[in-house]
């Protein structure tokens, strides 16, 4: 059971008093505590469906294309990746260090996946195979039940009809 507190104050401002603006503003105050909570509801005078407000267009000047420089005979040597740099007593990780660690982690998990695939029985009761087999069995059972309902012949008769129709057995 919930106890609802009475609304002590609702204040609605008359939108016709401010004719200079195109939007109406209403203020509701539900003060049940010492600290009042004020809600302001604004509505526009436009009609039609609700629309998401659009962002103002950004003004960018088009950049002039930079002519490509002449390629040198040898590419500049890449700097060795830095592990961590201490700046004002704080440890800063570089992008190259993160990239190198990400590649190492990818290789580690690839290797671990290959090792896990190599272990275990090739044939036998594996959970993934058992789930798949169970789903196929339930699907076949559901199809058999629907066929029995539609044709009136039971599951054993359906198997006999299938075997005779495919020419595997002559049961008639």
From Swiss-Prot:
Give the range the annotation lists for the signal sequence.
Answer: none
Tell where it localizes.
Plastid, Chloroplast thylakoid membrane
The record's statement on gene disruption is: High light sensitivity leading to stunted growth with pale-green leaves on agar plates, but unable to grow on soil.
Which InterPro entries did the record assign? PSII_Assembly/Photoprotect-Rel (IPR053091)
Q: Which Gene3D superfamilies match?
A: Chlorophyll a/b binding protein domain
User: Its family?
Assistant: Belongs to the ELIP/psbS family.
Q: Subunit comment for this entry?
A: Component of a high molecular weight complex containing OHP1, OHP2 and HCF244, and PSII core proteins D1/D2, HCF136 and HCF173. Forms a trimeric complex with OHP1 and HCF244 that mutually stabilizes each subunit.
Instruction: Tell me what this protein is called.
Output: Light-harvesting complex-like protein OHP2, chloroplastic
Q: Which organism is it from?
A: Arabidopsis thaliana
The major lineage groups are:
Eukaryota, Viridiplantae, Streptophyta, Embryophyta, Tracheophyta
């Amino acid at each position: 059971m919930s106890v609802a507190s009475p609304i002590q104050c609702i204040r609605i401002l008359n939108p016709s008093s401010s004719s200079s603006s195109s939007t109406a503003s209403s203020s509701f105050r539900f003060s049940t505590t010492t600290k009042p909570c004020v809600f302001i509801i604004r509505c526009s005078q436009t009609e039609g469906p609700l629309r998401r407000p659009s962002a103002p267009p950004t003004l960018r000047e088009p950049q002039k294309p930079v002519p490509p420089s002449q390629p040198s005979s040898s590419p500049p040597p890449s700097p060795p990746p830095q592990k961590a740099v201490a700046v004002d007593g704080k440890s800063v990780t570089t992008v190259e260090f993160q990239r190198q660690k990400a590649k190492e982690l990818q290789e580690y998990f690839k290797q671990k996946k290959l090792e896990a695939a190599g272990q275990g029985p090739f044939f036998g009761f594996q959970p993934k195979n058992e789930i798949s087999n169970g789903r196929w069995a339930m699907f076949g059972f559901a199809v058999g039940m629907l066929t029995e309902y539609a044709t009136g012949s039971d599951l054993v008769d359906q198997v006999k009809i299938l075997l005779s129709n495919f020419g595997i057995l002559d049961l008639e």
